[in-house]
Amino acid sequence: MDCVFCAIAGNRQPAYRICEDEHFIVLLDIFPLRPAHVLIVSREHAPFLKDLSVAARDRLLELSERVAAALRTLGHGHEGINLLINDGPASNQHVPHLHLHLIPRRSGDLLPLAWRALTRFLPLGRARIEARLQAHAERLRSALMVADQHV
């Protein structure tokens, strides 16, 4: 049985896709810790960072910088963005498939972040969250297209 990220990569599972390339799919986390919480998901099924190809590892940081710039353009993460890889089960990796979290932060958001970390998998307010995810995905896709035109 495929993991959820393999199913997304194979177009067998829907996702709020932002962009993709030969190595990664950029999408919104469906259980976001903060607004515009993005995942960069490997197309390769690689449970650990060391399992990624060298080409994919090289591309990961470049792509994360591009996505972080788009987030900041849209007003997310001006004060900071957590870049997080949970590398293996003991690191709280919920899906055993390499993915990088980009979590926009701002001063004083620790309490709401902690609350969301505790409640993020509960079905509370899912319709509202889904609407927000769709809006964030559209805005991020547009921001990345504009940025690509200026390169």
Regions found by a protein language model. Name each.
Residues 1-151:
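HIT superfamily nucleotide-processing domains
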